[in-house]
A protein has these predicted regions:
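Solvent-exposed beta-hairpin/edge-strand motifs
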Residues: 166-183
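Short, small-residue-biased leader/transition segments that mark boundaries at the very start
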Residues: 2-9
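Short, flexible beta-strand-to-coil junctions
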Residues: 9, 153-156, 178-180, 211-214
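Carbohydrate-binding surface patches
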Residues: 129-171, 205-211
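Aromatic/acidic polysaccharide-binding cleft in carbohydrate-active enzymes
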Residues: 10-112, 151-153
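Alpha-helical protein-protein interaction modules
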Residues: 102, 106-132, 152-155, 163, ...
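Generic recognition of flexible, low-complexity loop/linker segments
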Residues: 68-70, 79, 134-139, 162, ...
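C-terminal beta-strand-rich structural cap/linker in extracellular carbohydrate-active enzymes
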Residues: 185-214
Length: 214
């Protein structure tokens, strides 16, 4: 099978590079990159995949000014954040970035000490399939009682959304934000791991550490 072949390739060669996408061709769409990772992460360890983020300022004229999913409509922080469950790949020449891009270095420094811990867990997709309009994300299950969640609010008008996770039904869980725009909260997990998350801004994210209470 294709998945079996991919697993063999991974075990033999290490990280997997999925595909070239370039703003030159107008075929780099951040939500599609996120969707590829989300769909494959059920079958291939996310931490083995190299997922690209590009210079959103380059070739902006290749996209329609009315295209809601054009790279220029996203923050550079968000473009980096969609790669966090995988191996982030800066698919660009850093020398061509504008000065404002370097503010994302702060986010990178925040993530570096967390990456190994996040990747030690079993990483699975949660929420809805990324479509550019969804609430979606990933869960890293480090143990029965702790792990991490990355929650993404794509371009939609819903500031609070209940999504399915892999958390145990009926348990109380503490969610502590480590990166992004979320707030600390405690919730009781519903049927099918349902938990409500809140993000005030479109195309925003939060990386939470979670702890399941006894």
């Amino acid at each position: 099978s294709l998945v079996g072949s991919e697993m063999c390739i991974r075990d033999r060669y290490g990280n997997i590079f999925l595909e070239n996408r370039y703003t030159d061709w107008g075929n780099y769409y951040p939500y599609r990159t996120l969707r590829n990772l989300w769909m494959l992460s059920r079958y291939v360890p996310a931490e083995k995949m190299q997922i690209e983020f590009l210079n959103k300022w380059r070739n902006a004229d290749k996209y329609s000014t009315t295209d809601p999913f054009a790279p220029a409509r996203y923050s550079f922080d968000y473009l980096f954040a969609i790669t966090l469950a995988a191996q982030p790949l800066a698919w660009m020449e850093a020398s061509n970035l504008p000065e404002e891009a370097y503010a994302t270095a702060t986010l990178l420094k925040e993530y570096q000490p967390l990456q190994l811990q996040f990747h030690q867990g079993i990483i699975l997709p949660i929420g809805e399939e990324p479509s550019g309009r969804s609430w979606t994300g990933f869960q890293s299950i480090v143990s029965d009682t702790q792990g991490y969640l990355i929650i993404y609010r794509e371009d939609n008008d819903i500031a609070k959304r209940t999504i399915d996770t892999w958390l145990p039904e009926g348990k109380k869980v503490t969610f502590t934000p480590l990166m992004g725009n979320g707030k600390k909260f405690v919730a009781e997990v519903g049927v099918q791991g349902k938990v409500s998350f809140e993000l005030n801004d479109k195309n925003s994210f939060t990386l939470y550490q979670y702890q399941v209470k006894p």
